[in-house]
From Swiss-Prot:
Binding site for shikimate: 20-22, 68, 93, 109, 219
Positions contributing to NADP(+) binding: 84, 131-135, 217, 240
Function text: Involved in the biosynthesis of the chorismate, which leads to the biosynthesis of aromatic amino acids. Catalyzes the reversible NADPH linked reduction of 3-dehydroshikimate (DHSA) to yield shikimate (SA).
Binding partners and assembly: Homodimer.
Gene designation per UniProt: aroE
Residues of the signal peptide: none
GO MF annotation: an example: NADP binding
Designated name of the protein: Shikimate dehydrogenase (NADP(+))
Species in which this protein is naturally found: Sphingopyxis alaskensis (strain DSM 13593 / LMG 18877 / RB2256)
Pathway where it operates: Metabolic intermediate biosynthesis; chorismate biosynthesis; chorismate from D-erythrose 4-phosphate and phosphoenolpyruvate: step 4/7
Any Pfam family: SDH_C
């Protein structure tokens, strides 16, 4: 893979960070394009975040970083231009260093989530989303831009879910996790349910129409119980690697000035699940 400490370089920061697959993704693309550069993990604790940003800002070889938990909110106060993130998604997952050392923050999660759905016309379509955390905010932001119809949020905290509908100007309802699913066009799991080490997401998919799509943001395991149930019903599915790769593709171009190579996604997916 790409050589460590090559310049230019970008990083992914978080605490913990060892589990991140971002270095595999960006390293694969750098090698495939024959580009100079590197992308690596940086374990940054909360009390060292400001010092990390200040140090990297002064390094002209540093192109920026992706941001994972628990820093996605805190970094908004450490960049020069956070855009409209604070009042919308409320989380920043990408920082890009400009030639003058100024830092621009953005969030590629929403666009990354929507990339495998881009060919669909979801305007006015009914949607169901499981979860009301940070991932759900990115999902709802993207769905609002797509002008979807009513959105049902399945979540244990009704007030939090209703607040998200209001934040993104969406019409819809809050549904209990054990209630019957509405007959939606798209069902998205934006929670940690079904992830390795977490409780399963047990939903009865029988109310879904035959043309429904089931999208699970979880990618460990890749074939979650939800996706297996959807496949058993003959429904189209989208797994969590699509969002992971989609958001990384946008960040890669911001960091290194070139889009990822085309036609190599199957190789990349095989690398990520190996």
């Amino acid at each position: 893979m790409s050589h460590p400490y090559a310049s230019p370089f970008a990083e992914v920061i978080g605490d913990p960070i060892a589990q991140s697959k971002s270095p595999l993704i960006h390293g694969f693309w750098l090698d495939a394009l024959g580009m100079e550069g590197d992308y690596r993990r940086a374990h940054v604790k909360a009390d060292a975040l400001a010092a990390y940003i200040a140090e990297r800002r002064a390094d002209p070889g540093w192109r920026g970083c992706n941001v994972t938990m628990p820093h996605k909110a805190a970094v908004m106060d450490l960049v020069d231009d956070p855009g409209d993130i604070r009042g919308t998604i409320g989380a920043m997952n990408t920082i890009v260093r400009q030639p003058d050392g100024s830092l621009i923050g953005t969030n590629t999660d929403a666009a990354g989530f929507y990339s495998p759905l881009a060919e669909l016309d979801l305007e006015g379509a009914p949607i169901a989303v499981v979860g009301a955390g940070g991932a759900a905010r990115a999902v709802l932001f993207a769905l609002a831009r797509a002008k979807v119809g009513k959105v049902a949020i399945l979540n244990r905290s009704p007030l939090k879910a209703m607040g998200l509908l209001a934040t993104f100007g969406l019409k819809g309802d809050v549904v209990a996790l054990d209630a019957a699913l509405p007959p939606v066009r798209l069902l998205v799991n934006a929670s940690s349910l079904g992830m390795a080490g977490q409780p399963p997401l047990d939903l009865d998919l029988s109310p879904l129409p035959d043309d429904a799509i089931v999208y699970d943001l979880v990618y460990s395991p890749l074939r979650t119980g939800l996706l297996k149930a959807a496949e058993a019903r003959g429904l189209d599915t989208v797994d969590g690697l699509d969002m992971l790769i989609g958001q990384a593709a946008l960040a890669f171009e911001l960091f290194f000035g070139a889009p990822p190579p085309e036609g190599r996604d199957d190789e990349l997916r095989a690398l990520l699940v190996a």
